[in-house]
Design a protein with these regions (language model features):
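Hydrophobic faces of well-ordered beta-strands that scaffold small-molecule active sites
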Residues: 3-6, 24-26, 59-63, 90-92, ...
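Glycine-rich, proline-tolerant flexible connector loops at the mouths of alpha/beta enzymes
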Residues: 25-44, 63-70
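Active-site-adjacent beta->alpha loops and helix N-cap segments on the catalytic face
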Residues: 36-46, 95-104, 140-154
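N-terminal active-site wall of soluble small-molecule enzyme domains
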Residues: 51, 57, 62-126
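Conserved small/polar residues in nucleotide/adenosyl-binding loops
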Residues: 249-251
Length: 251
């Protein structure tokens, strides 16, 4: 079973390698869901890949934001550069981006991001027919659900699940609250996490919504803890957190 750790920057990548990760996932300056992380410039990725490969660790690069037309236009040179850098897999959440990656670099593995909300065998079979080698299942699934997904999915399609990390109140992050309240899209990696604010009850005025005066619990769900009982149905366990510190990666 593969242990996949986040690498929000080169320090985190080195830590993940040092403490036994089988693979790391990282984002470049565009197209990743962790826009506030340091991430990697495109010219830094070849050295990061070389370092990881020298230590027997694979590198997966995320391309999992909600894609708009301008985003799609920028994908071919993005995937070509990652291919030239020697990355092992693309993690993709949009079917259009998935198709572009297959056209540009068909020899690079394509993993379906949890943002695609794959939660059943039928969906897994469709992605497999499009060329996916792995699906990262929806974060809302129970261990029993994951076992059923493994049973119903093609045998050669790998299943990855998150074992630790934040749980969004929306289905695999498909939430518009941040966009509505702050103009920053959670589906573009800029979530302000208003589900974790505490709110003051009052009128419909925007001033009635204040993150600094607690009234009750937040809307967010606790982190998953399936790491304590790893089902054999999973090929890979992912640790969520492109923004996580070195200390968490060490643990």
């Amino acid at each position: 079973m593969e242990l996949l750790a986040p690498a929000g920057g080169m320090e985190q990548l080195r830590a993940a390698v040092a403490f036994g990760a089988d693979a790391v996932y990282l984002a470049a300056e565009r197209f990743g869901m962790r826009a506030r992380a340091a991430n990697f410039r495109m010219d830094e990725i070849p050295a990061a890949v070389a370092f990881a490969h020298d230590h027997g660790v694979k590198v997966h690069v995320t391309c999992n934001i909600l894609m708009h037309p301008d985003d799609i236009d920028g994908l071919p040179p993005f995937f070509r550069a990652l291919d030239a850098a020697g990355v092992d897999a693309f993690i993709i959440g949009d079917v259009g981006a998935f198709a572009v990656a297959g056209d540009v670099a068909p020899w690079v593995e394509r993993h379906v991001s949890t943002q695609a909300s794959v939660a059943n065998g039928a969906a897994a079979r469709v992605w497999h027919s499009l060329g996916a080698s792995r699906v990262v299942c929806a974060r809302e699934m129970s261990l029993a659900d994951i076992a059923r997904l493994r049973q119903d999915a093609p045998p050669d399609l790998e299943i990855e699940a998150f074992a630790h990390g934040a749980m969004c109140m929306a289905v695999s992050g498909r939430c518009l609250i941040s966009s509505y309240l702050t103009g920053r899209s959670g589906n573009k990696g800029h979530c302000t996490q208003p589900c974790r604010w505490s709110y003051q009850l009052g009128t419909a005025s925007p001033a009635a919504m204040r993150p600094d005066e607690p009234v009750g619990g937040d809307l967010g769900r606790p982190s998953p803890t399936s790491v304590v009982e790893l089902p054999q149905s999973e090929n890979a366990i992912g640790i969520q957190g492109g923004l996580k510190s070195l200390s968490l990666i060490h643990i």
